[in-house]
Amino acid sequence: MVNAEEQQYLNLVQYIINHGEDRPDRTGTGTLSVFAPSPLKFSLRNKTFPLLTTKRVFIRGVIEELLWFIRGETDSLKLREKNIHIWDANGSREYLDSIGLTKRQEGDLGPIYGFQWRHFGAEYIDCKTNYIGQGVDQLANIIQKIRTSPYDRRLILSAWNPADLEKMALPPCHMFCQFYVHIPSNNHRPELSCQLYQRSCDMGLGVPFNIASYALLTCMIAHVCDLDPGDFIHVMGDCHIYKDHIEALQQQLTRSPRPFPTLSLNRSITDIEDFTLDDFNIQNYHPYETIKMKMSI
């Protein structure tokens, strides 16, 4: 049986290769790009977890980065200590100097995702400052509203803060999401769905990671709110393939997607900050081998 949900990702990759607009980009690599393709939709029901199978996705990196966001952390060295290097380039001394952040210590990424999720509107000093009680804790507010007012239409998590963009090592690509609680009329359990808007979508490296990350966040919030996961919907703006990824993606397109794995959470948790790596159990993940692609910065 064809994995139709992963196939929609592969179909979009093929469409961009065939029809994408040739565009320059900030990194100088060059891209093929389309704008506002049809959203991707993934069911999270029955413990299904949308971890792409046509190449191996670094799930430990997905989990640890998300836990780092949830803690409100912005120091890439904390991830490097766990042998996760996805933020190394943007936190390097050379890169920070190149964008004018010469006074930042190496690894200090500025007020990026986690800071905005937990302290939106607070004044960013550095990655070592304690910001407890400062700014708007969007994540805590969402969880509280889901528990007390599940029909609320303001279950919004935004990483896009125009006042802070120049302080960030990299402005947020996955920038805004909305949660929705489905209250069934029958005896079924309520479900939590999430829709993400991503302004800049690197189809080769970033998007497979982002799909897994926001699906995981949805499952975690559902778990602490005693809901079942529903759907994850991925809405994309500038959806692009870096030219030096085309060959690798053409290789990936030759692979037939396999069934998605399942995700189980190993213990009862009511505080989202209590999750650790050991709480996530990915089963029946049988991907093809890794396909390496270079990150453009």
Curated annotation (Swiss-Prot):
The active site is at 173 (nucleophile). GO terms for biological process: dTMP biosynthetic process; dTTP biosynthetic process; methylation. DUMP binds at residues 26, 153-154, 199-202, 210, 240-242. (6R)-5,10-methylene-5,6,7,8-tetrahydrofolate binds at residue 202. CDD domains: TS_Pyrimidine_HMase (cd00351). It is an enzyme of class 2 (transferase). Keywords: Methyltransferase, Nucleotide biosynthesis, Transferase. It catalyses: dUMP + (6R)-5,10-methylene-5,6,7,8-tetrahydrofolate = 7,8-dihydrofolate + dTMP. It comes from the Eukaryota. GO terms for molecular function: FMN binding; phosphopantothenoylcysteine decarboxylase activity; protein phosphatase inhibitor activity; thymidylate synthase activity. GO terms for cellular component: cytosol; mitochondrion; nuclear periphery. Its EC number is 2.1.1.45. Pathway: Pyrimidine metabolism; dTTP biosynthesis. Belongs to the thymidylate synthase family. PANTHER family: THYMIDYLATE SYNTHASE, THYMIDYLATE SYNTHASE 1. NCBIfam families: PRK01827.1-3, thym_sym. Homodimer. This is Thymidylate synthase. It comes from Pneumocystis carinii.
